[in-house]
Amino acid sequence: IVIAAREGSDVRAIADGRVLLADWLQGYGLVVVVDHGRGDMSLYGYNQSALVNVGDQVKAGQPIAQVGTSGGQGQPSLYFEIRRQGQAVNPLPWLGR
């Protein structure tokens, strides 16, 4: 999903985990991917900066990036995705945690 947000505002980890990727990815701009174990991963795209590095352990609510427009969209926003066993799933239940 794409969530409109103020440019430069914090992007926070949805759950505890380990950073798998903090780099540019075509179509997503600057991306942070967090592995939460049990096959669950979260992807945060369109960032202006990453605040974590590959291998870092993160806690739920920890700032991991800052909102930007690196995905090529005109408005600052966050691309947010959850993958379970490699398949995209509805991220909305995760947002209520």
PLM regions with names:
Residues I1-R97:
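Catalytic cores of peptidoglycan-degrading enzymes
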